[in-house]
Amino acid sequence: MKAPIPHLILLYATFTQSLKVVTKRGSADGCTDWSIDIKKYQVLVGEPVRIKCALFYGYIRTNYSLAQSAGLSLMWYKSSGPGDFEEPIAFDGSRMSKEEDSIWFRPTLLQDSGLYACVIRNSTYCMKVSISLTVGENDTGLCYNSKMKYFEKAELSKSKEISCRDIEDFLLPTREPEILWYKECRTKTWRPSIVFKRDTLLIREVREDDIGNYTCELKYGGFVVRRTTELTVTAPLTDKPPKLLYPMESKLTIQETQLGDSANLTCRAFFGYSGDVSPLIYWMKGEKFIEDLDENRVWESDIRILKEHLGEQEVSISLIVDSVEEGDLGNYSCYVENGNGRRHASVLLHKRELMYTVELAGGLGAILLLLVCLVTIYKCYKIEIMLFYRNHFGAEELDGDNKDYDAYLSYTKVDPDQWNQETGEEERFALEILPDMLEKHYGYKLFIPDRDLIPTGTYIEDVARCVDQSKRLIIVMTPNYVVRRGWSIFELETRLRNMLVTGEIKVILIECSELRGIMNYQEVEALKHTIKLLTVIKWHGPKCNKLNSKFWKRLQYEMPFKRIEPITHEQALDVSEQGPFGELQTVSAISMAAATSTALATAHPDLRSTFHNTYHSQMRQKHYYRSYEYDVPPTGTLPLTSIGNQHTYCNIPMTLINGQRPQTKSSREQNPDEAHTNSAILPLLPRETSISSVIW
């Protein structure tokens, strides 16, 4: 049924009236061109989409039905881009179809991207607008295209709704849509404060971990429609002005400089979240902005964002004076402001007087630091430094030039077959390792009582004389030494006690193990307090036997300085011939040899050979005994005389006592009386007949 002619005229008038309301943007061939519409369609490949002619949704006050009734026709054209050739669209009716004022794609393909122009016209009027369609693919491994996302912001601890955008064309009014939500393309167990309402996701209390990409998925026929929204969480909108961090508002900051130098004034401030408003921070000198100053040497840097979190920012701006002149000195103010207010703080650029306080303090600080470093090095490596100095620049001690021995070694003698597992290492160290190292490696001359002492009177007086002839007294505190009270000899003899108390001799006490709990240990502590010049050195077991250990360095440091010189063969033989008992040692050794030779002279030949080999092998195994060998002339006789039960006497030529060997004469030249003319009767003490003390 056709409409009455008056009605058509009225409709046409109304339509043309509406066309005149909108301002024209362009005109070509009498057709008004509104260029490209602000609404852009973005879909993923394979999704359906409906493109509506925008003329009926904002450009004219009518709809498609009225326009069609007024005799206007709707035409669609496609072009690749603005200004390109437009060609009419041939609709196939299946994948791409024209339905009233829209074009439907079911589904879209990549080649569907472009500009779609809808034109309504008749013989008198023409109007045109273009709509953009972009078809894209998902990013690799994701369910969305990062260039086709929607963006939303939410304030911390407040509520936020995220809508599934542009799905109105796929919803049925009589049916609730079935929409699935994903976060970062993964299904998620949502917390109770997140609820779903039709096509929206409601977060009742936004948290910082709600930041992310939310994707809604809707099924439409045999197709899937997805929309992705990126949610950004910010701090709550601030209602306070910015806060100045430096310089402070409450006081005037003074910055000193010298004329001709470069000056840099930095202002830092904190800005709360103010939406999309950029922070405003700037410098002024008096009432002038820096840009208004005539000097090009004074300028502002760009605003730098130092920190940013949830929209809150810490920013800074610098005022630079390239070469300070007298006119540049003065008061500069830093201003910060936002929609809630303004704050400012001042810096006084002041000329610095020539003072050397800082330089002097720096120099003194450097010297103090150097002294601290040197003291620390000296504390840690004192012994090594002193040993190095003594070895290269030191001189031997002069106080002990009249003394024959470097040290008197006091220890407890325990035979090796009596060593047990617990004290074996200590005894081996005291009897073997310690003397060997001091004599053979460091070249010290030790007085070892068990080896060097030849009693001439009372035993205690002999020990006192030997200690007096030594520069140091070394006491080796082994468990056996403590149990047997080996130091008692130094307390009994008055001369020895006075030497310890007055500091006449320096004592080196070597503790070989943990002595606490051992019987008589309290007396050891009392002895330490009695000795005036005492050094205690700990021996911590076999690890201290290494040559480079701290133990030997400390011991060498406490011993008298002695340059290590190569020991010749003759010196090695005569190492113990000096001192107050040198001659007696020689005589003792010779007398022992003589006694042994005489005893063997009357023995069976096989017994003599066996005893000779056994004796010398045992004497060489124990280094702390020194053997003296003398070849008795075959024809010589050494008569032995026994007086009582106390001593054994031996007739020895005086030439042997003086350390000389007789020159052998022929039997015709030799005087029969010479063999006994220069002879002497010397006693063989009980010690020379294998009886010796235990503690020395």
Swiss-Prot record:
Gene Ontology CC terms: axon; cell surface; cytoplasm; dendrite; glutamatergic synapse; plasma membrane; postsynaptic membrane
Residues covered by the Ig-like C2-type domain: 19-134, 143-232, 242-350
Catalyzed reactions: NAD(+) + H2O = ADP-D-ribose + nicotinamide + H(+)
Expression across tissues: Detected at low levels in heart, skeletal muscle, ovary, skin, amygdala, caudate nucleus, corpus callosum, hippocampus, substantia nigra and thalamus. Detected at very low levels in tonsil, prostate, testis, small intestine, placenta, colon and fetal liver.
Membrane-topology annotation of the record: Single-pass type I membrane protein
Gene3D superfamilies membership: Immunoglobulins, Toll/interleukin-1 receptor homology (TIR) domain
Coiled coil start-end: none
Residues of the TIR domain: 403-559
Glycan attachment positions: 63, 122, 138, 213, 264, 331
Record-level Gene Ontology MF annotations: NAD+ nucleosidase activity, cyclic ADP-ribose generating; signaling receptor binding
Domain of life assignment: Eukaryota
EC number(s) from the headed UniProt entry: 3.2.2.6
Membrane topology (Cytoplasmic): 379-696
Main location: membrane
Keywords: Cell membrane, Cell projection, Cytoplasm, Disulfide bond, Glycoprotein, Hydrolase, Immunoglobulin domain, Intellectual disability, Membrane, NAD, Receptor, Repeat, Signal, Transmembrane, Transmembrane helix
InterPro entries, alphabetized: Ig-like_dom, Ig-like_dom_sf, Ig-like_fold, Ig_sub, Ig_sub2, IL-1_rcpt_fam, IL-1RAcP-like_ig, Immunoglobulin_dom
Pfam families reported in the protein's UniProt record: ig, Ig_6, TIR
Family classification: Belongs to the interleukin-1 receptor family.
Name listed for the protein in its UniProt record: Interleukin-1 receptor accessory protein-like 1
Lineage start: Eukaryota, Metazoa, Chordata, Craniata, Vertebrata
Gene: IL1RAPL1
